Amino acid sequence: MNFLFDLYGTLADIHTDEKKNELWEGLAAALNENDAQALRSEYLAFCDELSKKRAHRFVEFDLLHVFEKMLGFRGISKDKAPELARKFRVLSRERLRLFPCVKEMLAELKQSGAGVYLVSNAQSCFTRDELDELEISGMFNGIVISSEVGVEKPHSEIFDIVLAKFSLCKDDCVYVGNDLHDDVLGANAYGMRTVYIETEQSGSYPELDVIPTYAVKDHGDMKKLLLSLN
């Protein structure tokens, strides 16, 4: 059996605040700018510019290009973009930790012969570092991040990419996530079984008529269920 996991809100408990003054003041200092709020407006304008170029709503642009544009606007080498992106993320982040049982669950699934994959709507310039920080990068058989492949869940194309990249069959895959729209709706429609866990980061979709194959109340139950399915 192959288990495909969402990251944020499913395996990792995260909270960020991209509006707080400390973020924009810190970024302004890094760029030798005086007006932190003007810098925020510039960032949002560049994001909006890239967003408007998308062919459809589930196309995922790479946020690193925004940081490259901000640097280029100031005559600074684009090579500094990953460093600026890391600073942005660290300053915006208020919490990042694994949910209970996650490391043990991933390790036991792999030990039992299951395939363990990460399929996340995320920005690679943030997420690759955070996977290392959480010490779980090496626990997956494969990783697909939406900004790297240009499309996000629930669009079927991201599941096409995952199955082709890792030579998987959807009948042998179970998708695990905390979002009824991005995770359950997409994987259900694709023909995979789904496991849903509600966490603080779960979206609210009162009008969405979607039912997961399984629902668990906590990560201890998730671990038991997935091991029983393998």
Segments from the language model and where they lie:
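Asp-based, Mg2+/Mn2+-dependent phosphohydrolase catalytic module
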Residues: 1-3, 13-14, 29-37, 79-81, ...
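N-terminal helical cap/lid subdomain that shapes the substrate entry/recognition surface
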Residues: 1-100
